[in-house]
Amino acid sequence: MAITIPTQIEKCKGAMLATAIGDALGWPNEPRSKNRIEKPKVNDFFVEWTRSCKEPRWHDERILPGEYSDDTQMTLSVARSIIVGDWERFLAEKELPFWLRYERGGGGALLKAARSINDKKELLWQSPYHAKAYFSAGGNGAAMRILPHVIANANRADISALMLDVIKDTLITHGHPRAFLGATCYAFALDYLLRKDTVLEYGELVSAVIDGQQSWGAFPNHDVFGQ
């Protein structure tokens, strides 16, 4: 039986949808999800659960089946920013501060970055009080939101443009090299899958990522924002 390879448009739609689905399925089981159940049962379907929150005051938040976390929220924020244009400025000055009004499950680095822009109109690396925390932020918050950049750069032959966009995005919230490498590595893998027009062989993606480390692991231009 012949296998039909999805078109790039179908892959993009599927990836965006799968992002939200995977987020909604996995969020209750994350160690930092603040799930009231300490060891929740892992399910392959959406569940309702209760999350313990402390902002603006201690309370229990009801999470309905299929609702997603900050990972999908920020993915959509990046997508909207790209659609609007001048995405770096729109993401940092509009989307990120406004996200504080509806955020769910945001990590420490992301929250600090958003609050710094919202309260002081400055990025974390511009603040002498937050520089240490910023350059120690090596989580996967940036990697979780870079899918829209892969989609936006799908028609470009040179992957360096995608890597630059991912680095710019990461810079807004994270400063540790691990955060950059995680985001660029993941973006490279997604880009490879998007361009693949035959059935993926066993181990092929791992080999492709290893072989492509000169692309996703390259030292970036020190002045990526042109400032």
Predicted regions span which residues?
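Structured, active/binding-site neighborhoods that engage oxygen-rich ligands
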Residues: 1-227
